UniProtKB/Swiss-Prot annotation:
The active site is at 156. GO terms for cellular component: cytoplasm. It catalyses: N-acetyl-L-glutamate 5-semialdehyde + phosphate + NADP(+) = N-acetyl-L-glutamyl 5-phosphate + NADPH + H(+). It comes from Moritella abyssi. Keywords: Amino-acid biosynthesis, Arginine biosynthesis, Cytoplasm, NADP, Oxidoreductase. The lineage of its organism: Bacteria, Pseudomonadati, Pseudomonadota, Gammaproteobacteria, Alteromonadales. GO terms for molecular function: N-acetyl-gamma-glutamyl-phosphate reductase activity; NAD binding; NADP+ binding. This is N-acetyl-gamma-glutamyl-phosphate reductase. It is found in: Cytoplasm. SUPFAM superfamilies: Glyceraldehyde-3-phosphate dehydrogenase-like, C-terminal domain, NAD(P)-binding Rossmann-fold domains. InterPro entries: AGPR_AS, AGPR_type-1, NAD(P)-bd_dom_sf, NAGSA_dehydrogenase, Semialdehyde_DH_NAD-bd. Catalyzes the NADPH-dependent reduction of N-acetyl-5-glutamyl phosphate to yield N-acetyl-L-glutamate 5-semialdehyde. Pathway: Amino-acid biosynthesis; L-arginine biosynthesis; N(2)-acetyl-L-ornithine from L-glutamate: step 3/4.
Length: 336
């Protein structure tokens, strides 16, 4: 059994991770941690998430930087479901103790220190760790994930977008002079568990945000190798992402070429479901680890639609896929 600790355990993604780790036949949940000043420290985990009563009842523990060496005794895996700056500050400490780190923040997703000053507002001080980090888009980086000790789990919007676009880019099907246009709507859980007026029940309304300045746009462009236009929307539902992507294809690309690109990429990927000429929906992926993908073509115009659960395939489930890849377990272990 691989001893696994979870830092940032009390957020929505943390709760999903705690459940996945507990269900995994090869992992042992060895600790649930929050910041040392968190009001949740000392509480039973199931007092926050009642559906996990009798499943995850461990006491939530405070994490102090001075205790990292001590708590890493015999620990194999550290999962960070923490804020970007927190992951930036503590990932190297855990790596130094010989653990394998899976980070769900944005702190190590792009191997360029300047990226963080420009888009995240902090100076990145860990060049060695940043250079060694692998971007954990599970279906696209399995060989690198299997060898890495720091895996940066992609964001929810990038997962929904990149998985739709990378097969096209890989085969050179996207017109070079056109930027794919991504419109994606996410459930309110994407805003996190912290109270906010904008996500309050009586206030939330379907609306765009972060127009031209959302930090996931450069993350998508960087890992696609092609500039995109990305507009996120906040939806008035709890969980899930539905992305509609408009792509201008290279002249002469046939529907058969598009279908072949997607089939080649995903025919052996159990967590991706191809739905040609059908319509993905949030209902079909909610509370699952699946990625649903469909497309329709008219001449040079291609519309691609993808759906995921933002907390699962967009976060916790993809982290678990990366754990499975890294340690040689079946891809679907604990997920289905």
């Amino acid at each position: 059994m691989l001893k696994t600790i979870l830092v940032g355990a009390t957020g929505y993604t943390g709760a999903e991770l705690a459940h996945y780790i507990t269900k995994h036949p090869e992992l042992e949940l060895a600790g649930l941690y929050v910041s040392e000043h968190s009001l949740d420290a000392g509480k039973p985990f199931s007092s926050l998430y009642g559906h996990l009563l009798g499943v995850v009842d461990q006491t939530i523990q405070p994490l102090a930087l001075s205790n990292i060496k001590h708590i890493c005794d015999d620990v194999d895996i550290v999962v960070l479901a923490t804020a970007h700056e927190v992951s930036h500050d503590i990932a190297a400490e855990f790596l130094a103790q010989g653990t394998v780190v899976f980070d769900l923040s944005g702190a190590f997703r792009v191997n360029d220190p300047a990226f963080y000053e420009k888009y995240y507002g902090f100076k990145h001080n860990f060049d060695k760790e940043l250079k060694s980090a692998v971007y954990g888009l599970a279906e696209w980086a399995s060989a690198d994930i299997a060898e890495a000790n720091l895996i940066a789990v992609p964001g929810c919007y990038p997962t929904a977008s990149l998985s739709a676009l990378k097969p096209l880019a890989q085969h050179g099907l996207i017109a070079a002079e056109q930027k794919p246009i991504i419109n994606a709507v996410s459930g309110v859980s994407g805003a996190g568990r912290k109270a906010s007026l904008a996500s309050a029940f009586c206030e939330v309304s379907h609306a765009p945000y972060g127009v031209f300045n959302h930090r996931h746009q450069p993350e998508i462009s960087t890992h696609l190798g092609h500039e995109v236009i990305f507009t996120p929307h906040l939806g008035s539902f709890k969980r899930g992402i539905l992305a509609t992507i408009n792509v201008k294809l290279v002249a002469g690309v046939t529907p058969e070429q598009v279908t072949a690109a997607y089939q080649e990429a995903y025919q052996d990927q159990p967590m991706v479901r191809l739905l040609p000429r059908r319509t993905p929906s949030i209902k079909a992926v909610e509370k699952t680890a699946y990625y649903d993908l469909a497309w329709q073509q008219q001449g040079q115009d291609l519309i691609v639609v993808s759906a995921i659960d933002n907390l699962l395939k967009g976060a916790a489930a993809q982290a678990m896929q990366c754990i499975n890849i890294r340690f040689g377990f079946a891809m679907t272990t604990s997920l289905v």
